[in-house]
Regions:
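N-terminal Sec-pathway targeting helices
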Residues: 1-16
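Solvent-exposed, non-transmembrane regions of membrane-associated and secreted proteins
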Residues: 20-257
Length: 257
């Protein structure tokens, strides 16, 4: 009987150690991937920074509506035609390509710029948004600890931080554009109690636009003193927020000029 109990204890200990080792490996693998993908994005950003600024892609390049790609995004666009823009915020770690895959809407939730599987994913635009025409571009990014990806948006919960970082740079392939932050708020997704901000892409009329902005201001964590009017172009940045189940942290900004 004692031998039987000893065997059970040994088996249990082996199983426990095996589980601990597996979990440890998974954690190590995750953070190793975070570091690897972070470095890869830094290399992509360096390509953009070092790119020439006075050339454009030839007229026969496959660009929407025949427009020319900005010189600094040429090489990246030719590597992956799912790229639709670039987002950055001065003084923050957010400095990434932005993708869109209309036929596979959430593809970049779990894929990197090279279309390889990645837990970090790549910031991407909601599939029903038209980069050139929509009133509101909804852009998603993972909330990764350490201020990586859209995890850096967590800092916008503080008004004092907002005061030092009031604008967002979001370039399309053909236009460099600055956006002014209108509101920062928290809500929950997939719930009747939450605000379905992701449903607003194109305003049906002025009332529809004002209703969206009004709800954003109502939920805002603080008053930015900035609002938006019918005809303004918006971007809405969305990432996970962990104070509630299916929580979301949302930053809404309007195009300047």
């Amino acid at each position: 009987m004692k031998n039987y109990k000893s065997i059970i204890c040994v088996v249990a200990a082996v199983c426990l150690l095996g589980t601990a080792a597996f979990c440890g490996f998974r954690i190590y693998h995750y953070y190793a991937e975070v570091d690897e993908q972070t470095e890869a994005f830094e290399e992509i950003a360096e390509m953009v920074e070092q790119a020439p600024t006075d050339e454009t892609v030839p007229d026969d390049a496959p660009v929407s509506e025949g427009e020319d790609v900005l010189a600094k995004y040429q090489e990246l666009y030719l590597q992956n035609e799912d790229m639709v823009g670039w987002i950055s915020i001065a003084g923050m770690t957010i400095n990434y390509p932005v993708m869109q895959s209309r036929n596979n809407p959430n593809f970049y939730l779990k894929h990197n710029f090279e279309k390889e599987y990645s837990d970090l994913g790549t910031p991407y635009v909601q599939e029903n948004c038209d980069i050139a025409e929509s009133d509101n571009l909804v852009i998603y990014g993972h909330h990764i600890k350490g201020g990586k990806m859209f995890g850096a948006l967590e800092d916008y919960k503080s008004k004092s931080f907002y005061e030092e970082h009031k604008t967002i740079q979001f370039d399309t392939l053909t236009e460099q554009t600055e956006y002014e932050i209108v509101a920062v708020f928290k809500t929950v997704a997939y719930s009747s109690e939450g605000f379905r901000y992701y449903d607003f892409v194109d305003a049906e009329n002025e009332e529809d636009f004002n209703s969206y902005i009004g709800k954003c201001k109502e939920l805002a964590l603080y008053d930015t003193g900035v609002t938006a009017g019918y005809g303004d172009r918006l971007i809405t940045l969305s990432t996970c927020e962990y104070s509630a189940q299916n929580g979301r942290l949302v930053v809404v900004a309007k195009k300047v000029g």
